[in-house]
Amino acid sequence: MNYNQPATLQAAILDWAGTVVDFGSFAPTQIFVEAFAEFGVQVSLEEARGPMGMGKWDHIRTLCDIPAIAERYRAVFGRLPSDDDVTAIYERFMPLQIEKIAEHSALIPGALQAIAELRGMGLKIGSCSGYPAVVMEKVVALAETNGYVADHVVATDEVPNGRPWPAQALANVIALGIDDVAACVKVDDTWPGILEGRRAGMWTVALTCSGNALGLTYEQYQALPAAELERERTRIEQMFEGSRPHYLIETIAELPAVVRDINARLARGEMPQGN
């Protein structure tokens, strides 16, 4: 049997918060701030957004490794935060996250239409998240009431290593029966999610405006003056440079056009690993 390069995409693997739901990715960021505050440690929204896309325990560990936050922790507890301390914060974070996830569960404008168009082009819809399974159960149920059902969902604690490792994306490939990683496109609003797709050998699409990096509500995004939006886009594109996304678009509403372009590139023999 000979190897044949894929001629078209077979699946889109979509992130959740900031990509399909929760414009601005507010649900996780605000809860990180609140969880640290319950331990007497101040963390700003901007700081909380930094590692977004990682699994939530890893996210908290990364925050605790930031020198300024570590020093604030030392000022309260007289020591630097250990893994046990990270687990304690995580265990406070989880019930807060489950309790408040519904407050930021609205679908991103244009998401349903874009996903329907992808299905019309023959793509399966996989998905993964930095949320653990106990949170994803609620996120998935809320999305279903709004009309969105992915073909497969992989939570961060359902694989040995979460983002930026490729395990969640590859778990989707296996579950969806995709025969080539180059026939997949990974869509995410964070650099760990783009690295995940890159390391899995997939096409990657970074979202510059709907998610964590811009950090605004849809209404605030719509109201931004053109010059300010352009400055923000430039800043966010620079933030993504290290993860090397194949495409950058503002929101998932623009994804069908990207899929058509990728299909044209595949038909010409191009592969994601070579770009």
UniProtKB/Swiss-Prot annotation:
Record GO cellular component, one term: cytosol
Required co-factors: Mg(2+)
SUPFAM superfamilies, per database record: HAD-like
Catalytic activity: phosphonoacetaldehyde + H2O = acetaldehyde + phosphate + H(+)
Amino-acid positions noted as binding Mg(2+) in the UniProt annotation, renumbered to this chain: 15, 17, 189
CDD domains named in the record: HAD_PHN
Cofactor binding note of this UniProt entry: Binds 1 Mg(2+) ion per subunit.
Coiled coil regions in record: none
A single GO molecular function term of this UniProt record: phosphonoacetaldehyde hydrolase activity
Record: active site: 15, 56
Keywords for the protein's UniProt record, in alphabetical order: Hydrolase, Magnesium, Metal-binding, Schiff base
Entry's induction text: By 2-aminoethylphosphonic acid.
Biological process, per Gene Ontology: DNA repair; organic phosphonate catabolic process
E.C. number: 3.11.1.1
Keyword Cytoplasm: no
Role: Involved in phosphonate degradation.
Assembly, per entry: Homodimer.
Record-given protein name: Phosphonoacetaldehyde hydrolase
Species per Swiss-Prot/TrEMBL record: Pseudomonas aeruginosa (strain ATCC 15692 / DSM 22644 / CIP 104116 / JCM 14847 / LMG 12228 / 1C / PRS 101 / PAO1)
Biological classification of the source: Bacteria, Pseudomonadati, Pseudomonadota, Gammaproteobacteria, Pseudomonadales
